[in-house]
Amino acid sequence: MKRSNVYDSENEKKLHYKNVKNYFKKSAADKCGFYELKSEEKLERELKKRSMWKVYTSTLNEILKSDLNISNGIDVACGMGNFTRELSKHKRFQNIIGIDFLKETFDIAIKTKNKFLNTSFFQGDLLNLPFKDSSFELTVCLNTLHHIHKNDFLKAIYELSRVTKKYLMIEIRNKNYIFYSWKTKIVLPRLYKDLPIYSNSIFKLNKLMEKNNFKLKILRGNSVISFSSWRLVAVYEKF
């Protein structure tokens, strides 16, 4: 690749992450009192209405039932901590980490720390996680990888795999989705405007994870036929 092309690619990537940061800063500002203004019951009802929440929680429960020795975990790109809180509801976790690149988002969670048992929040970069290899028995990264620039996807998967000791639970936007063209050309531009959404093939992801010494354990989506769903949650077990 010519030097000018590399330069253009790097500039395009920097602009992408700048737009992502601005998007989530605005989102954080809009939700600054998310936990403070809600009772536990109202919060639970609101989360259960979200399209993927049942998939998230049932997948987590299946992991925990299959291995009774999981005692620590990390929620990477935790945002304001919705799923971090879900992890903390399981008393077996002695240590939970929530990490996000934007302090404004997890500050929403920190304001109500009583809702997060055995949990600490840190600011950090998914592409350069500040943890030793195999630090966490369960690593979770949900509703995030579609915001990672296509040139950084391999690096993101490597970092998530590197810090994982047992199980990695991740979500992707699926290139094998049956209505992919309609979704990417019509629906997403209206929702995200100038913010690109990067999708990935579950089949290619499975091969990549095998190279990182992980095998597919669970696959669930937001439609009946999982592998053709737009949003996919995959759990990989280290071998």
Model-derived regions: residue spans:
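Class I (Rossmann-like) S-adenosyl-L-methionine-dependent methyltransferase catalytic domain
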Residues: 1-70, 80-128, 148, 152, ...
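Conserved S-adenosyl-L-methionine
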Residues: 77
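Short, well-ordered alpha-helix to beta-strand connector turns
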Residues: 93, 136, 164-165
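A conserved beta-strand element that flanks and buttresses the S-adenosyl-L-methionine
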Residues: 140
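Short catalytic micro-motifs in class I SAM-dependent methyltransferases
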Residues: 143-147
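A short glycine-rich, Lys/Arg-flanked "PGG" loop and its adjoining helix->strand segment in the class I
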Residues: 154-166
